[in-house]
Amino acid sequence: MGQDKKNLTAAAAAAYVDDSTTWESFGLDARLLQAIDQLGFENPTLIQSSAIPLAIEEKRDIIAKASTGSGKTAAYSIPIIQNLLQDESTEREIKSIILVPTRELSNQVSQFLEKLLIFCNSKIRLINISSNLSDQVINSLLINKPEIIVSTPAKLIQILEKNVNSNLINLSTVKNLTIDEVDLVLSYGYLEDLQKLESYLPIKKNLQTFLMSATINDDLNDIKSKFCSRPAILKLNDEDSNQNNLVQYYAKTTEFDKFLLTYVIFKLNLIKGKTLVFVNNIDRGYRLKLFLEQFGVRCCILNSELPINSRLNIVEQYNKNVYNLLIATDETNDFTIQEDEKDEGEEIEENKNEENDGKTSKNTKKPNQKKDKEYGVSRGVDFRNVACVLNFDLPTSSKSYIHRVGRTARAGKSGMALSFVLPLNEFGKHKTASLSTAKKDEKVLRRIVRQQSNNGFEIKPYQFDMKQVEGFRYRAEDAFRAVTQSAVREARIKELKNELVNSDKLKRFFEENPQDLASLRHDKELHPTRVQTHLKRVPEYLLPESARADHKKIGFVPFHKNKVHKNRKRKPSGRKPDPLKSFRPK
């Protein structure tokens, strides 16, 4: 099982592993131990060795703070399953609720739980009600009273309110409540849903609670007071282990030069490994994709307009190295702007101006734009082996920046983050390439630098050698002119149609034929209105000297080649001699 076992191994860095503890020391069920061994977990991580005994033996509530890749999911999943296996009750009841902020994360948590339940799935059943299932299918699954429910807060409340007068879903029997990525759950505006959930749960009884997050702040106090009693607070001090793994840069550039530099970076393969590019809106993502496609740079898009099945498949294929370049739309900025201003302590007048700007920007948003409110990629989703995070558009808050760069340098691996920053005096000079949020780039950068400095991290300025890049400018301008607003709109419609077809295939055909899933790709070219095939080839004279191929000098080559045939006998010049005149008698 060698190679498969390595592929299933959780992304826990060596710095997080607790070699002094074994899984057998927790007294886990044999079926659970067998599943853990099949996953390739040799030893528990530090957060697991601290949380699991407290949760199983002492039945304590757990509030855990640890970095991405430290094993937080297993830290709450294993105690939940162990307690359910020890439960001698024979009645089918809903006993555990796991809440996550996004549908993508709910899918990943469900897949991980299914691997842990592989040897005991007849006793413990699991349902992910945030998956793309109809209400009728979900209701039919809930009738069987699954022991574990994974959901987003909004979806769970929706089902509870629809079935308030029926006995379809009863949470009075729940013994465990888990909120994963609790800080993001709050920033997504789920606090009201959590308050509604309080009335459905047996909080005054023996309800065990897990609150897991990479950051812990004052916003957590309200949740802690509602759902926890005498919690054990675990903080894994892993800043030192992460500090040397992530290298952060920012580059000040103009609006159009963002596209120019991105073209040069990916066409010349200046970044080795997989890259995650963040943009601030959906149109921006398609504009960048159409721009890069003209140079033969293949990439795929991830945004809230795509069907959930397609989004999950894109993340899965990206993690399997099917794609090396993913353009993700981060639409969480609106939730964090005001929070970030309060946390960073900006001046009152500056806050007022920014709030007013925020209001006007909200009013100018396009109506009737259907988006999935439970979409999120900048935090929580497990992007594996990301070598670089490129902030093509700088986020509007330092919190969002932390969430983005947290997708790389995970689990002890090295990574790099590069952010493009637009100086204020360059804003609006290139209207087609302009973005409204870029007006505050310098202000946001100051907050980011200050916050990272307080945490012991450094963001270094990076200066591109524009003399080397200048030769590519005319090609970039030619390609950018082809990406018109109508081309972007047509690309969005075409992509949505393709993904709707793909989503239907994923839902039906590929469930029965998983081996054919590899044939479904999401990085197909969308083509702008004007296709210019010559742009896909980079002439050698544009390359820097270090990147040019070494050719032997062959000397001077004349324009006209002498027509000399070496193998043909040389003809005598002039007329042939007359044999009568040349004949001489002896």
Swiss-Prot record:
A motif (DEAD box) lies at residues 180-183. It catalyses: ATP + H2O = ADP + phosphate + H(+). Residues 339-375, 560-586 are annotated as: Disordered. ATP binds at A66, S67, T68, G69, S70, G71, K72, T73. It holds the Pfam family Helicase_C. Its main location: nucleus. The keyword rRNA processing applies. Gene3D superfamilies: P-loop containing nucleotide triphosphate hydrolases (3.40.50.300). One of its GO terms (biological process) is maturation of LSU-rRNA from tricistronic rRNA transcript (SSU-rRNA, 5.8S rRNA, LSU-rRNA). Residues 560-574 have a biased composition (Basic residues). Its EC number is 3.6.4.13. ATP-binding RNA helicase involved in the biogenesis of 60S ribosomal subunits and is required for the normal formation of 25S and 5.8S rRNAs. The Q motif is unique to and characteristic of the DEAD box family of RNA helicases and controls ATP binding and hydrolysis. This is ATP-dependent RNA helicase DBP9. It comes from Debaryomyces hansenii (strain ATCC 36239 / CBS 767 / BCRC 21394 / JCM 1990 / NBRC 0083 / IGC 2968).
